[in-house]
């Protein structure tokens, strides 16, 4: 084949023509997603939304004062008069990574401008990580397709545009990279590389946890994957040391951060990994003492028993988990809890995803993912021509199903649906494409079939990018939030920037400002003034008092 033509050699590696094609397509995916993510910059080079302003201020503190001071920092501009212990309740690795990146790559740019650009760059680099991850699951073609689909996946774009200096872009980068290293590690035959990848995967996945709490989602598919590993792989001696190594490194590394902290080990996340690891050993032992013909059967019976007991124990220990686990994460497991916490329910990004929103967000990915699920389940159809490892096949199904499930709780988590559908779609399309191009009929029909297939897939891929009017690309054509005052109106003014600048230059430096919590971070960062409440929502009682005050008459309010 032309693609296998050798171009040059670097050490023992033969650089072939198809490597150029892969690199070119990855550059295309990176460039495409970066341009789409950069659309808000045409209205003004500002941070998006609200939380990024606090994250900028925290990163600035590290750059100006160092890491040791950061971990001792009690932010006295927040939640007056108590302040806020920043390292204990914020995304530490986001601040550290951005600060280190600025020192290395910042050059002569201001830190503010650097943090505006940071999420778009990190989000765009994630197309390479998703390529590597899906390549491990389904091959190079699947990886390329995944990178192209991920580049335009709407929920991922929305929460990773230029100026979106929040936790999701970096959290996804670390989370998917850690997942890739883990899966690649348990596939690698060289023991030295296996240990290196597994240890690195555990540490980097913990970085993801310290960057974004939503990365706890990745624990669910990993835990379920560990449960079924002894049933789909026969190298039990390898599993007996590699899996505990990964779980131990991940939990210890995560526990070393103040958030999530040591409580992760015996919280819901830790148990979701520790119990499957114990099960792994027991299942291996059961299979070892079973007769050859009954090994898998007995292992499956034990798995069913453990799942039933696990569900029962979850119900029995619900009060324990409610004390050790954030309500938002419990809500992701049980979407029916949404309305029990009014403060959580009042936040727009915590609203339940509607059916219409799901179709807008994922549209064609649903069809491609359905194809992927069908192909994975009907493995015998393609078994003779395409090899898809059983363990990787199972993981693709697990992450696909679990991603769709947890996203049903919050609109914010819809990006996990996109990631799941991208993985399933890429695997399905890659296998189907290979099968189509292997069909040999008459020369004329052969060309017609292949051209028709390419046109059909291309049209289906392009439709959500251009139709309807509010499509996957145009959805990001909006001004940074500070230009619209946080409203949903399509406008761009400097009113808020002028107001905050006026506060900064015309009020005493020791002023204490009371506003609705949405605007706390803006006032602290752009006006350089202390606030009573802010977007961290650390004290629900204070927020309730402000709500009552704003909804009361002037006499009652005071």
Q: How would you name each of these model-derived features?
A:
Residues 397, 402, 406-441:
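Hydrophobic/aromatic-rich transmembrane helices and adjacent perimembrane loops
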Residues 192, 235-241, 292-303, 367-398:
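Membrane-interface helix-loop-helix junctions at transmembrane boundaries of multi-pass membrane enzymes
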Residues 2-8, 13, 27, 45-47, ...:
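Extracytoplasmic
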Residues 29-33, 70-77, 118-136, 141-189, ...:
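Membrane-embedded helix bundles of polyisoprenyl
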Residues 268-284, 300-381, 392-393:
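Alpha-helical transmembrane segments at the extracellular/periplasmic loop-to-helix junctions
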Residues 1-39, 50, 144, 280-310, ...:
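Start-transfer (signal-anchor) and selected internal transmembrane alpha helices
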Residues 80, 84-96, 105-128, 161-165, ...:
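Loop-to-helix entry region of an early transmembrane alpha helix in multi-pass inner-membrane enzymes
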Residues 13-52, 57-58, 64-70, 74, ...:
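Transmembrane signal-anchor helices characteristic of membrane glycosylation enzymes that use polyprenol
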């Amino acid at each position: 084949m032309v693609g296998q033509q050798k171009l040059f050699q670097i050490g023992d590696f033969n650089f072939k023509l198809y490597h150029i094609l892969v690199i070119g397509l990855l550059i295309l995916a990176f460039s495409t997603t970066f341009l789409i993510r950069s659309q808000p910059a045409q209205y003004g080079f500002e941070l998006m939304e609200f939380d990024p302003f606090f994250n900028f201020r925290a990163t600035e503190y590290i750059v100006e004062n160092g890491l040791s001071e950061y971990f001792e920092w009690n932010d006295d501009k927040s939640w007056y008069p108590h302040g806020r212990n920043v390292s204990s309740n914020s995304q530490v690795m986001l601040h550290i990574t951005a600060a280190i990146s600025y020192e290395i790559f910042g050059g002569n740019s201001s830190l503010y401008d650097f943090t505006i650009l940071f999420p778009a760059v990190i989000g765009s680099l994630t197309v390479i990580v998703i390529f590597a991850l899906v390549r491990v699951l389904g091959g190079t073609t699947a990886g390329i397709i995944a990178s192209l689909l991920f580049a335009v996946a709407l929920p991922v774009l929305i929460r990773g545009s230029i100026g979106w200096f929040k936790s999701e872009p970096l959290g996804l980068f670390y989370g998917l990279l850690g997942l890739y290293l883990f899966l690649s590690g348990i596939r690698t035959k060289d023991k030295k590389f296996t240990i290196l990848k597994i240890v690195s995967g555990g540490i980097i996945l913990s970085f993801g946890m310290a960057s974004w709490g939503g990365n706890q989602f990745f624990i669910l598919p990993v835990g379920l994957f560990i449960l079924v590993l002894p049933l789909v792989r026969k190298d039990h001696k390898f599993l007996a040391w590699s899996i505990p190594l990964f779980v131990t490194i991940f939990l210890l590394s995560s526990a070393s951060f103040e958030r999530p902290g040591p409580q992760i080990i015996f919280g819901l996340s830790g148990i979701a990994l520790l119990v499957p690891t114990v099960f792994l050993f027991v299942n291996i032992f059961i299979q070892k003492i079973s007769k050859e013909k009954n090994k898998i059967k007995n292992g499956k019976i034990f798995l069913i028993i453990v799942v039933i007991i696990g569900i029962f124990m979850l119900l029995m220990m619900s009060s324990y988990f409610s004390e050790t686990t954030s309500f938002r994460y419990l809500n992701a497991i049980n979407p029916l809890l949404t309305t029990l916490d009014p403060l959580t329910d009042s936040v727009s990004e915590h609203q339940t995803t509607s059916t219409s929103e799901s179709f807008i967000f994922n549209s064609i990915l649903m069809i491609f993912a359905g194809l992927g699920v069908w192909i994975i389940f009907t493995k015998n159809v393609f078994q003779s021509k395409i090899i898809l490892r059983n363990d990787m096949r199972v993981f693709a199904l697990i992450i696909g199903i679990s991603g769709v499930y947890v996203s049903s709780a919050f609109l914010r988590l819809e990006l996990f649906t996109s990631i799941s559908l991208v993985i399933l779609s890429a695997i399905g399309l890659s296998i189907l494409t290979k099968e189509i191009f292997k069909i040999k009929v008459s020369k004329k029909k052969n060309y017609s079939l292949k051209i028709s297939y390419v046109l059909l897939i291309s049209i289906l891929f392009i439709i959500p990018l251009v139709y309807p009017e509010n499509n996957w690309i145009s959805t990001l054509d909006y001004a940074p939030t500070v230009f619209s005052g946080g409203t949903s109106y399509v406008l761009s003014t400097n009113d808020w920037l002028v107001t905050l600048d006026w506060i900064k230059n015309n009020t005493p430096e020791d002023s204490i400002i009371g506003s609705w919590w949405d605007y706390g971070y803006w006032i602290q960062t752009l006006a350089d003034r202390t606030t009573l409440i802010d977007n961290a929502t650390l004290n629900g009682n204070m927020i309730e008092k402000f709500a009552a005050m704003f909804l009361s008459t002037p006499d009652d309010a005071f």
